[in-house]
């Protein structure tokens, strides 16, 4: 075995930190509105950004092209089909395709898999350019604050109720879109992510924010995320839990 030491870089002074941020990812996925977070979360994130600016941290808004986000989601879902649907009977996949699932890959082939991986590399290259000029990217974790827990239901090892309705500012959205839209893309691309708590809604529900780093820069991201939390984070122990 090779012992690779973990070396943490030095902290940058606040005025040398450069943070990119985006308040939404501009695309609707599976017919779900995913391009606008809840008003309560938006206010808290706006306050978080303002605190960073007051501490002389450079914060610049980054807007992603809808075509890029849509393409990345297509790659994510096609990979999911190739690597996960493999365990389903072929008739199940054919049925999904006939019912209009645009991401179901039928039939499988090595060439298709390599093509999807190449497209993944292309999405990674575009995202990596963001980190040429910034220490981190911050964006929402979910479309809203925490909501009432949905008890999972399984059948034959499969989660059944991942499309339960969640109300965001009066609009009904499936919980899979609420929970995963802002996180799955970084699972696809392999970026390290840290979630820090930044505030609470008027009803006391917590809101967090993702701090995303460049690939293979986990140690640096830990330092940057800690700095951002020290400046603008907000954590409270839940009632009934010891400090």
Regions found by a protein language model. Give the residues of each.
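Amidase signature
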Residues: 1-181, 188, 216, 230-243
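A short, aliphatic-rich beta-strand micro-motif
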Residues: 192-196
